[in-house]
Amino acid sequence: MTRLLPGLLPAIVLLVPFGVAQPFRFPTANHSLYEKGGGEKFLVGTPGKPWTTGAFGCVRTDGWQMHEGLDIRCLQRDRQGEPIDPVMATADGTVAYVNRQPGLSNYGNYIILRHQVDGLEIYSLYAHLSQVGPGLAVGQRVKGGDTIGRMGRTSNTRQRITKDRAHVHLEYDLVINERFDEWHKRHAPGQRNDHGMWNGKNLLGIDPRWLYLAEAEHGARFNLLQFMRSQTELCRVMVRETRFPWLRRYGSLVQRNPVAEREGIAGYEVSLNFNGVPFNLIPRAASEMKSG
C-alpha cells in the first residue's frame, strides 16, 4: 500500500462526495483527515513532538514505540477548556466491553464495539473518555453515529494528558484469543489483568487512517475484507497446527488451496503485516511444508 501523508492525498480522495454511504464514520465531528494539509488539525501529537506522533505506527520514542491508533484532536471545549466533543460509534455494532474505572488502564475510560462488516469481525475502541454514555452496557446494539460517550483526558499513566492535548484515541482491532485471561495467568503470574480478553495486549490494530482513505477512494465499492487481504506483507510464518483461535474467528481470511483440500491440512502459511496482523492464511498439506 502506497504511503502518503494526508496533505498529499490524491485528488480522487479529496473530491469524494461525503454523502456516499460507507461502513465506517469518524468518531467525532473532526473530519480534517480529508482536507489538504489537514493532518495537524486532525491529530494531536505527544508533548513537544509533531502531530505525526498521534498517528498509527512506529511513531513514538524516535520510531521505537508502536502506537496502535489515532489520537483525534478536540474541537469543542467548555469554559474551563475541557473537551466536550461527543464521541460516536463509527459503525453499526454491539457493545463488547465498557471500562468506567479510568485508574485501571492507560486507556482511561474506554469502550469497545464489535462490528460485522463484509463477513469480517472487527472491533472499534474509543479511549480517554471523560464520560461513558449513561446506561451503555455490554450486549447493547448501537447504530453508526450514535453518541456513546464524551471526549476527555482520562488515563492511568504517570504523565497526564493535558488540556491542549485532549483527544479520543481510536483503534480498529482484531482479537487475538478469547482465552487471553488464561494465557495471561500462566505467562504473567502476579501481574494484574483487569479487563479479561479486552486487555489491549490481546488486540491487534490496523491503521484507521488508511481504512478511512480507502473508503474515500472506493466509495460504495469499499469492501473491508478486500482491504484486509490487501495489507502489505512483512513476512510469512508456517504454523504446524490445524486448530487455533484465529482460524475460528477469522475464517474469512483463509485462502483456498486445492492441494491441502485433496491431501489434508497439516498446517497454515500465515502472512503478517508490519504490526503482526495475520491477514492471509493458506492451508498447506504435509507435502508442501518444508521440514526444519
Please report, for each region that a protein language model flagged, where it lies by residue.
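Positively charged n-region of N-terminal signal peptides that target proteins for export
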Residues: 1-4
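Bacterial N-terminal signal peptides
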Residues: 7-17
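Long, contiguous hydrophobic alpha-helical segments, chiefly transmembrane helices and signal peptides
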Residues: 69-73, 87, 127-129, 148-151, ...
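A mature extracytoplasmic/lumenal domain signature
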Residues: 74-76, 100, 115-117, 128-130, ...
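Sec/Tat-exported extracytoplasmic proteins
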Residues: 76, 99, 133, 146, ...
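Zn2+-dependent peptidoglycan hydrolase active-site motif and core
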Residues: 82-84, 90-135, 161-167
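Conserved, short, structured surface segments that act as functional micro-motifs
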Residues: 105-106, 110-114, 140-218
